């Protein structure tokens, strides 16, 4: 895309655009993350054998909290929030440990640990200058690249019909995913001006219509929901267990590294500059405190969504007002269950067709960031070793078998966390005198 095309206000953080122009871009962001936002709740609810009506209410709360968190990231309150176009949602990072704690203490034990762990992360986030020292550009670039690689399997799983689907890979899913992907590409080729950046929304609509006529869209629950429903505060009695709190706090630290990576990627890819200390601090504080708020509504921790970083990497649309309309749609979905049911009916294969290209864009952007850091021997060592260990080891999780369950739960399948730690350690121990 030429520099001339970037002059449209939609590509500016605070560009003035109309509501009618903003809504399609906001809706595109919400559709890109909607299924991933509610899936963690459903997984953990199944493990703790939560009644269907309760898990349904939590799905509604998840949408409300994600919308509130996104608004705070966009428009900070005091030092809470980054001021960047970061979309928030319920994090998959905590699913494994939530299942373990939930099976041991029940869902109330999970909520107590989320409340305390979120407050601790929020407090640590205030020390941005210490985080900044740990993440020079080469570390941030390596983490961004790993985020892209970690999401490729997510896109592929959705393309085939969704994780755990007994009919995974069947022809209907592949057909719908392919039609969606081709629609995205075709729209991007033939559309003009900033309308090109709505290719994901166009693909989602085309894929949804095709999936509907193929019998893949379930609308049966639409007739059963209330018109308006206010999410319940404190739906579970919280319990506070030291081991559960400690376990969640460790995962909150891992989540913070992912947030740092997402925030760094957002500024590098979307705003074409380095991330600022106050942006890192605001992102982490928002992650922590909004996660604590999430527990009050009975939901799991909330964090920045890499899927939406991928969307910005592909479209370069960073306008905060446009993303804000998406946050408002999420809040409305939390208050009007029918809207939530409609959005949740989006088939996984449709989502997969759109996200494949988005997630690949993060990988390419990360590689570009590494190139901008320079290919001296120190940077090459940090990037290559961190990516090799982080991606390689997590693709072979049995290599973690000698470690305690807590370590395995945190790192065995989380390549972003492993990449961050390895890159951070190498940055500390490798002498800067080796730079060429």
Task: Give the residues covered by each predicted segment.
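Membrane-embedded helical hairpins/re-entrant loop segments and their flanking transmembrane helices
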Residues: 19, 45-81, 249-320
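Hydrophobic, membrane-embedded alpha-helices of multi-pass small-molecule transporters
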Residues: 20-32, 169-180, 198-199, 214, ...
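Juxtamembrane interface elements at the cytosolic ends of transmembrane helices
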Residues: 3-7, 37-41, 45, 180-190, ...
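N-terminal signal-anchor module of multipass membrane proteins
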Residues: 1-85, 93-101
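Intrinsically disordered, low-complexity non-transmembrane regions of multi-pass membrane transporters
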Residues: 1-25, 220-233, 268-275, 279-283, ...
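Membrane-embedded alpha-helical modules
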Residues: 101-220, 325-436
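Short, non-helical or kinked segments that cap or interrupt transmembrane helices
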Residues: 57-58, 79-92, 133-142, 195-201, ...
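Hydrophobic, small-residue-rich membrane helices and short re-entrant helix-turn-helix hairpins
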Residues: 190-205, 227-236, 248, 261-285, ...
């Amino acid at each position: 895309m030429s520099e001339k095309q970037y002059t449209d206000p939609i590509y500016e953080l605070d560009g003035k655009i109309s509501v009618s122009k903003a809504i399609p871009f906001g809706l595109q962001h919400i559709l890109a993350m909607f299924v991933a936002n509610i899936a963690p709740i459903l997984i953990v609810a199944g493990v703790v054998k939560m009644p269907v009506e309760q898990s349904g209410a939590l799905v509604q709360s998840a949408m409300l909290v994600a919308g509130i968190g996104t608004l705070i990231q966009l428009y900070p309150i005091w030092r809470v929030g980054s001021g960047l176009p970061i979309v928030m949602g319920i994090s998959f990072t905590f699913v494994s440990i939530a299942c373990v704690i939930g099976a041991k203490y029940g869902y109330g034990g999970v909520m107590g640990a989320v409340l305390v762990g979120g407050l601790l992360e929020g407090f640590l986030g205030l020390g941005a200058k210490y985080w900044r020292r740990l993440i020079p550009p080469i570390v941030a670039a390596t983490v961004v690249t790993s985020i892209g690689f970690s999401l490729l399997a997510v896109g592929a799983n959705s393309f085939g019909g969704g994780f755990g689907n007994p009919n995974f890979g069947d022809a209907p899913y592949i057909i719908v995913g392919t039609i969606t992907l081709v629609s995205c590409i075709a729209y991007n080729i033939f559309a003009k001006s900033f309308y090109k950046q709505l290719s994901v929304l166009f693909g989602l609509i085309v894929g949804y219509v095709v999936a509907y006529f193929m019998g893949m869209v379930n609308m049966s629950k639409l007739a059963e929901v209330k018109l308006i429903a206010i999410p319940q505060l404190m739906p579970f009695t919280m319990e506070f267990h030291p081991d559960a709190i400690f376990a969640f706090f460790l995962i909150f630290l891992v989540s913070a590294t992912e947030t740092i990576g997402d925030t760094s990627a957002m500024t590098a890819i979307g705003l074409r500059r380095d991330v600022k200390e106050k942006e890192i601090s605001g992102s982490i504080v928002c992650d922590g405190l909004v996660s604590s708020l999430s527990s009050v509504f009975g939901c799991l921790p909330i964090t920045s969504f890499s899927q939406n970083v991928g969307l910005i990497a592909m479209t370069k649309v960073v306008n905060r007002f446009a993303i804000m309309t998406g946050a408002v749609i999420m809040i409305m979905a939390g208050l009007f269950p029918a809207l939530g049911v409609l959005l949740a009916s989006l088939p996984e294969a449709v989502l997969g067709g759109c996200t494949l290209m988005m997630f690949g864009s993060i990988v390419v952007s990360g590689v570009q960031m590494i190139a901008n850091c320079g290919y001296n021997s120190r940077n090459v060592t940090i990037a290559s070793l961190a990516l090799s260990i982080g991606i390689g080891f997590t693709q072979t999780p049995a290599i973690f078998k000698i470690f305690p369950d807590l370590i395995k739960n945190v790192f065995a399948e989380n390549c972003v966390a492993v990449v961050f730690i390895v890159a951070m350690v190498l940055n500390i121990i490798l002498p800067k005198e080796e730079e060429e």
